[in-house]
A protein has these predicted regions:
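WD40/WD-repeat beta-propeller blade N-cap
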Residues: 25-33, 68-75, 110-116, 150-157, ...
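Residue-level detector of Asp-centered blade-edge/turn motifs that repeat once per structural unit
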Residues: 40-41, 81-83, 123-124, 164-165, ...
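Hydrophobic beta-strand positions that form the internal "hydrophobic ladder"
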Residues: 45, 86-87, 128, 169, ...
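Conserved strand-to-loop turn within each blade of WD40 beta-propeller repeats
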Residues: 48-51, 89-92, 131-134, 172-175, ...
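Electrostatic cytochrome c docking/interface patches
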Residues: 308-334
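C-terminal capping alpha-helices of c-type cytochrome domains
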Residues: 384-429
Length: 429
């Protein structure tokens, strides 16, 4: 199956969506829901996924209004613009600007050289900020023109936000820094934190909230001084959301929970635990009491952020666990993080990534029918237990430069060995 055909098949699966009840969950993506945004009036949401698609949803009618297909890799960030349009950004380093109802983007913003993982709109609605793994932030004038490039991070920039007055841009990086960029000039202040950072949000009073690899949520003054911290999860926090009034912060953990924190008291109010976790994306409704979460099981759920309960616990058309037959196999559980993008059998074909059937002994970027990037085709790697283990030891971005694979490492040698042993058993039958 060609890459184009694969995308068309994914698109076909997105269209016949099913919903029940006034608060039914939203299902339609073919991979984990990586990004969420809710319109200012609370009537619409847009989601982005590892399946390379973005979906515009009506939250009043619980229907998918539009499937937006443009990106060649995971859609990592989505945002509503003040004029009603939508911006999507992906691991393909492109930003697309959409008018709802149109099948192609109004504009494509190019300039980044690595995956784009976060977007933010200035308070006046005139500028779009993007954070990228090329170690930069770019500020795009939405009325046209060249972007301003903010550089200085030593590693991936994972989060970006504007100050409430629009005079500053705040970035969070995997180099464990929060950077505050003065837009009226070239001034920047750098504030070091104890852990690599994955996300940043700004409260209406200007307080900076950042979180990352340690599982802690850090609270900084508008000037960057550390005011406090809350342990949200025992594993990395991958995304933050803040309620419109700034009273609550939601922290999505990579392995199984969403912590709801009272920003004023620095107290953990609730921990959301239920189906669909771990959570990749989270967003508050305008009421500040309701959350949307996007999970690994491809379903978007609504939660009462105050009580911690799902608003509707029924999942419509939830997919069967593709690893059910391997229950109890530790290697299969390690592989679960990869199952959204890769299949194990020839019958299942390709997903967002190529099938792993007969992986070992195959030269990188040579599987027929899959559209690999030119950069991967230049690499001299033959997949084996040793090379796959190395991939997850140092990360795809370092081992396979030019990849569109989400950045993920496995720190434990035992877990890496369990993974490659599992792949050896199930992909060579």
């Amino acid at each position: 199956m060609s890459s184009k055909a694969s995308r068309l098949c994914v698109a076909a699966l997105l269209l016949p969506l099913a919903f029940t009840g006034a608060h039914a969950q939203l299902r339609g993506h073919g991979g984990p829901v990586r990004a969420l945004a809710i319109s200012p009036d609370g009537t619409r949401a847009v989601s982005g996924s590892f399946d390379t698609a973005a979906i515009l949803w009506s939250l009043t009618r619980n229907v998918a209004e539009q499937v937006m297909r443009f990106h060649d890799a995971a859609v990592n960030a989505v945002v509503f613009l003040q004029d009603g349009r939508i911006a999507t950004a992906g691991a393909d380093a492109h930003i697309a600007i959409w008018t709802p109802g149109k099948q192609t983007p109004d504009a494509v913003l190019d300039g980044h050289t690595g995956p784009i993982v976060d977007l933010a709109v200035s308070p006046d609605g005139k500028t779009l900020a993007s954070a990228s793994w090329d170690h930069s932030v770019r500020l795009w004038p939405l009325d046209g023109g060249l972007p301003r490039v903010l550089e200085g991070n030593a590693q991936n920039v994972n989060g970006v936000a504007f100050s409430p007055d629009g005079k500053e841009v705040i970035s969070a990086g995997y180099d464990a820094t929060v950077r505050i960029w003065k837009l009226a000039g070239d001034g920047v202040s750098v504030h070091n934190l104890p852990s690599p950072l994955n996300s940043v949000v700004i409260a209406p009073d200007g307080e900076i909230v950042a979180a990352g690899a340690s599982g802690k949520v850090f609270f900084l003054s508008p000037g960057g001084d550390l005011r406090g911290e809350v342990e949200a999860a025992p594993t990395p926090v991958i995304q933050l959301a803040i309620s419109p009034d700034g009273s609550l912060v939601a922290a999505a953990g990579i392995r199984g929970s969403v912590a709801v924190i009272d920003r004023k008291t620095r107290k953990l109010v609730r921990t959301l635990i239920g189906p669909g976790l771990p959570v990749w994306s989270v967003a508050f409704f305008p009421d500040g009491k309701t959350l949307l979460t996007g999970g690994t099981d491809r379903v978007i759920r609504r939660w009462n952020a105050v009580s911690g309960e799902p608003i509707d616990s029924a999942v419509v058309g939830a997919p069967e666990d593709p690893l059910k037959q391997y229950a109890g196999d530790h290697g299969a559980e390690v592989f679960r993080h990869c199952v959204a993008c890769h299949t194990l059998t020839p019958d299942e074909g390709n997903k967002a990534g190529p099938t792993l059937w007969h992986l070992f002994g195959r030269r990188i970027a040579t599987l027929p029918g899959y559209n690999f990037s030119p950069a991967l085709k230049q690499l001299d790697i033959v997949w084996s237990k040793q090379t796959v283990s190395k991939l997850f030891e140092i990360g795809p971005a370092h081992y396979t430069p030019g990849t569109k694979m989400p950045e993920q490492t496995i720190g434990s040698p035992e877990e890496r060995q369990a993974l490659v042993d599992f792949l050896g058993r199930v992909t060579t039958k």
